[in-house]
Amino acid sequence: MDDNHILAAIINAKKGISQYLEIMELFPKSNVAMDHNFQRKYNAFYRVRQRNENWYRVYYQFMEDQKGHNISFTEVLHYFKMKLGRYEPSFSSKLLATHNPDMPVWDVHVQSNIDLKPPPYYSSKKFELAQSAYQKIQAWYKDFECSPEGEKIINMFDNLIIESKFITNT
């Protein structure tokens, strides 16, 4: 990726960066299960939409209950299967990354950028495949941030974004 494309991507991300930082500042200070302001900001940033009331209640209560605990992608994924009967790899990763910003997010942009095909929703092994896919995302970030291109992008980001010290490389 050339410098102009990197610069354009960073500039385009500025609004999202401020939204992200606000969420991460609010997270430890509020009871996210009850704080509708936090939920509104989180839902807007991560595009959480069209879920029923029970889904939001379970999601944010679990997010709150896990504060201070070392949780894993697998635990979150299986919790939502057990409590909601749903396969939610993307929202599981977003909850995890809110607790531990060093953990990557699973979304279509990340998958596209690293050429990773998600497990099919109809697969009987989708949970196992999702765990493997998430490990591949983690490995990709670990390798990329040490690569010459990764170092260049991180340095440009750090130089252009004043708040970069509050944002992890994943």
Regions found by a protein language model. Give the residues of each.
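An N-terminal alpha-helical hairpin/helix-loop-helix interaction module that forms a charged
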Residues: 1-85, 101-170
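Cytochrome P450 catalytic-core helices
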Residues: 92-95
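A short His-aromatic
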Residues: 98
